[in-house]
Amino acid sequence: MFALGSFKTFIGKCREDSVARNQMEAKCRLATAALLVRVATVDSDISEVRSKQLHRILRSRFGLDDSSATQLVEDAHAAERSAIDLYQFTRLLNRALDDKGRHQVVQMMWEMAYVEGRLNGFEANVIWRTADLLGVPSRQRVEMGQQIAAERSILASS
């Protein structure tokens, strides 16, 4: 009888851990999407090209269908509008992601910034501040940006 009770406790704990993990993943997706929205809108309203890129990034990186990506974008716009600063997003991502995950967030931001083939100072500043808050070294941040810029110029000339 004792073993059965312990097993039930173990199963209950596994379910709780699974729910908590799913909730944390959803929060990380929202925080990442909100940072991408910040990059996309920092200098103006979001253009159609940027909107499509935002959906594309979220679908490919998080394995979302169109409906889920659209809902995440709507939620991200609301979260970004109500945010006082970047810290509320980066604090969560720092707790939940390893170095590789934090680097991927910065890479997604570069992909968002360079979608139209150019980078402005506002976008660069948001990426710099976010990377700094995420603990991504300046050299790696710059290298990621240069790599994305090179890829964009190759695609644009093709």
Where are these regions (language model features)?
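Small-residue-enriched hydrophobic alpha-helices in membranes
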Residues: M1-R38, V42, S47-S158
